[in-house]
């Protein structure tokens, strides 16, 4: 699975993700070092790591962790996926790369490492944040979204609806909130014959659909629209997961919604996301196992 920031370790306390006493308002970031998560890591030279972080104060930053591949004690398990930590960062004037001096784990969800699909969902969201949000443009809401997804995974395992909620929220933060209920071109309510055009911002009414001829345009049925509307109306991935069990929606609705959002994301990023390819392989393997 490409894009995964290292192999998660074992948690010191498996119950910690659900324990409110672990930290007081961990996302507030009122003092101390920046709070953040690892999006990905790349080996650098013999003993260093190039670490891409998303922090509450600096947004997405790239830092060099000297000696991180030889000494685990210095960074105390904070360079893994599914870990929220405080990172001590420094940078020379006019320097491009930050230096990561040390880190302290604040909260961890690494007990999820045994669930390959949960790790795949977490890796996908890390790649989404890395790809969609600009460097060094802090958006604390992005960190909240990542943590909320991890909480949803810990609460009940992988959830397609929770993942759709994260996609919608991150697209919104990136300035490309998908049109779901009204036409992205004219603003009118949707009716029969609507399509979803990723390049034009989402839903397109029948009257405007004649000019939607680009690759990726697809039918936008009422069931798909209602499914996305229901998810967008929820308060984040933890509550959105309830939509998975809603009998109003069919497997076709869920698949169409997923494909529509993925097409929009892929168009914005300009390349396929490697973590999505891995998720597709996991899905195919699961279907074969049921046959």
Feature map (PLM): residue ranges:
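Non-catalytic alpha-helical scaffolds and adjoining flexible linkers that form interface surfaces
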Residues: 1-49, 54-291
């Amino acid at each position: 699975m490409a894009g995964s920031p290292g192999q998660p370790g074992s948690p010191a306390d498996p119950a910690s993700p659900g324990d409110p006493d672990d930290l007081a308002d961990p996302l507030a970031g009122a003092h101390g070092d920046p709070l953040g998560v690892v999006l990905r890591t790349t080996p650098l030279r013999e003993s260093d790591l190039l670490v891409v972080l998303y922090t509450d104060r600096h947004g997405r930053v790239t830092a060099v962790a000297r000696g991180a591949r030889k000494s685990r004690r210095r960074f105390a398990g904070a360079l893994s996926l599914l870990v929220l930590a405080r990172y001590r960062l420094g940078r020379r004037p006019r320097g491009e790369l930050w230096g990561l001096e040390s880190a302290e784990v604040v909260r961890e969800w690494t007990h999820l490492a045994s669930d390959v699909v949960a790790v795949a969902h977490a890796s996908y969201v890390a790649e989404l944040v890395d790809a969609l949000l600009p460097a060094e443009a802090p958006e604390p809401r992005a960190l909240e979204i990542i943590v909320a997804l991890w909480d949803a995974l810990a609460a009940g395992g992988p959830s397609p609806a929770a993942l759709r909620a994260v996609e919608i929220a991150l697209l919104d933060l990136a300035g490309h909130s998908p049109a779901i209920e009204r036409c992205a071109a004219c603003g009118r309510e949707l009716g029969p014959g609507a399509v979803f055009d990723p390049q034009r911002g989402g839903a397109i009414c029948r009257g405007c659909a004649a000019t939607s001829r680009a690759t990726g345009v697809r039918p936008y049925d009422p069931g798909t629209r209602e499914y996305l509307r229901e998810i967008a109306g929820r308060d984040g991935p933890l509550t959105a997961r309830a939509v998975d069990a809603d009998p109003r929606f069919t497997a076709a609705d869920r698949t169409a919604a997923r494909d529509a959002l993925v097409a929009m994301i892929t168009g914005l990023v300009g390349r396929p996301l490697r973590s999505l390819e891995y998720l597709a392989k996991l899905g195919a393997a699961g279907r074969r196992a049921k046959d």
